[in-house]
């Protein structure tokens, strides 16, 4: 009986020793997680550090780009300002130092005045036709020819101040003479309309006077 008790105690002690973990197992188990955690922390720290450094480089690059763009914009504005100032000064010098040269404008303004001389209100067709031909031949054509080389209308404007009024007066006098002629016995409209010497002479003198004025003032 005593022998059996001793045997059971020995078996229990052996079993206890077998089930107890060894110091090597404890050390290996406890150190591996620590190493992994340390490695993970180190890797995470390096990644965060690298990530934090990369934006800094991009920010610096963006800052340089913004500064360069700002310098370019400033230089461009300065160049534009100088260009505009130069154009403005050149334009001002031209306006002050050079006479205006626009033959088309001169032509248009003279034609506007010539167009005011009308014979539409003349009742008789023969008289109206003859007057229109006289004005075209002795007034419009010579005036258009003489203003061909005139570029600045302001210099010759005074030559046309009385043209419209004088022409209308000449037309009225001719119409009056025509009516007096047709009122005579044995006269007719055609014959009376053929006496053109008086009105033609008046219109020709007007045209000659204007041409001389333009020639002496256009340059």
UniProtKB/Swiss-Prot annotation:
Location of the protein in the cell: Secreted
Q: Where is this region: Disordered?
A: 19-109
- Basic and acidic residues: bias regions: 72-107
> Could you say which residues form the signal peptide?
1-19
**Which InterPro entries does the record cross-reference, listed alphabetically?**
ALL3/gSG7_salivary-like_helix (IPR056799)
Q: Where is the composition biased (Low complexity)?
A: 30-43
A Gene Ontology biological process term? immune system process
Expression sites by tissue: Salivary gland (at protein level).
Per UniProt, the keywords (alphabetical) are: Immunity, Secreted, Signal
Q: Does the keyword Cytoplasm apply?
A: no
Q: Where the protein is mainly located, per its record? A: secreted
Q: List the protein's name.
A: Salivary IL-4-inducing protein
């Amino acid at each position: 009986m005593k022998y059996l008790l001793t045997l059971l105690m020995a078996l229990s002690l052996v079993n206890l020793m077998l089930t107890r973990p060894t110091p090597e197992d404890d050390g290996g188990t406890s150190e591996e997680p620590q190493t992994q955690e340390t490695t993970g922390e180190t890797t995470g720290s390096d990644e965060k550090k690298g990530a934090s450094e990369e934006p800094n480089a991009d920010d610096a690059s963006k800052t340089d780009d913004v500064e360069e763009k700002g310098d370019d914009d400033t230089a461009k504005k300065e160049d534009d300002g100088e260009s505009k100032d130069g154009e403005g000064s050149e334009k001002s010098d031209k306006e002050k130092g050079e006479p205006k040269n626009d033959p088309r404008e001169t032509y248009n303004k003279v034609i506007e005045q010539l167009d005011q001389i009308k014979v539409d209100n003349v009742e008789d067709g023969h008289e109206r036709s003859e007057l229109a031909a006289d004005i075209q031949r002795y007034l419009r054509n010579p005036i258009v020819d003489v203003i061909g080389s005139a570029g600045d209308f302001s210099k010759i404007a005074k030559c046309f101040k009385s043209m419209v009024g004088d022409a209308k007066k000449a037309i009225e006098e001719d119409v009056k003479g025509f009516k007096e002629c047709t009122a005579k016995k044995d006269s007719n409209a055609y014959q009376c309309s053929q006496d053109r010497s008086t009105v033609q002479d008046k219109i020709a003198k007007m045209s000659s006077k204007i041409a001389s004025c333009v020639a002496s003032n256009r340059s």
